[in-house]
């Protein structure tokens, strides 16, 4: 249809084999470089490395390309957010009362695991609540990664710049929906 797009793509919802390729630490590039970088060997304490966004291109089909980016800075940000959510989950565990299950992807209660205790195999009436270390590790593997799908042929660095401006576009839509006020318009025909 002739339209060009750059859209976010969930790494968590990809097929297992595609996700393994996307999260493989090899074959990333730094902007302006033709050499491949293994991101697992990066010295993220180096300020320049910390500020750099690395990328890899993965052809999806003849028209689409998946661009996976990795940012040590974004990784640190996501870890800090999750760490505060884990602390909030621990507070829920430490406080007496009903334990609740996390209903949305950012709810700290999603890190709380409910285990039934029963020796006879009957339905247990007693539960043990604990931090779900498996869930925490599962989410940690995506730290620093972001993916977009595009049908634009061109330099992946330009596509990354388009995606970096995405938050500004989203912010403008939020303003339009929440803060923009207009008076009603009445249209009247002469006949």
Task: Give the label of every model feature segment.
Residues 1-191:
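Anion-binding and metal-coordination hotspots
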């Amino acid at each position: 249809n002739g339209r060009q797009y750059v859209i976010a793509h969930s790494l968590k919802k990809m097929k297992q084999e595609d996700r393994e390729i996307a999260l493989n630490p090899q074959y990333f590039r730094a902007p302006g470089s033709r050499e491949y970088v293994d991101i697992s060997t990066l010295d993220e304490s180096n300020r320049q490395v910390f500020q750099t966004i690395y990328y890899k291109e993965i052809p999806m089909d003849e028209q689409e390309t998946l661009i996976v980016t990795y940012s040590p800075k974004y990784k640190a940000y996501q870890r800090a957010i999750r760490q505060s959510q884990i602390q909030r989950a621990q507070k829920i565990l430490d406080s007496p009362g009903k334990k609740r299950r996390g209903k949305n992807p950012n709810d700290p209660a999603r890190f709380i695991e409910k285990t039934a205790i029963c020796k006879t195999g009957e339905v247990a009436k007693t539960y043990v609540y604990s931090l779900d270390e498996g869930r925490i590790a599962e989410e940690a593997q995506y730290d620093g990664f972001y993916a977009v799908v595009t049908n634009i042929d061109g330099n992946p660095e330009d596509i990354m710049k388009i995606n970096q401006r995405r938050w500004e576009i989203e912010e403008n839509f939020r303003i339009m929906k929440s803060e923009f006020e207009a008076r009603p318009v009445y249209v009247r025909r002469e006949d």
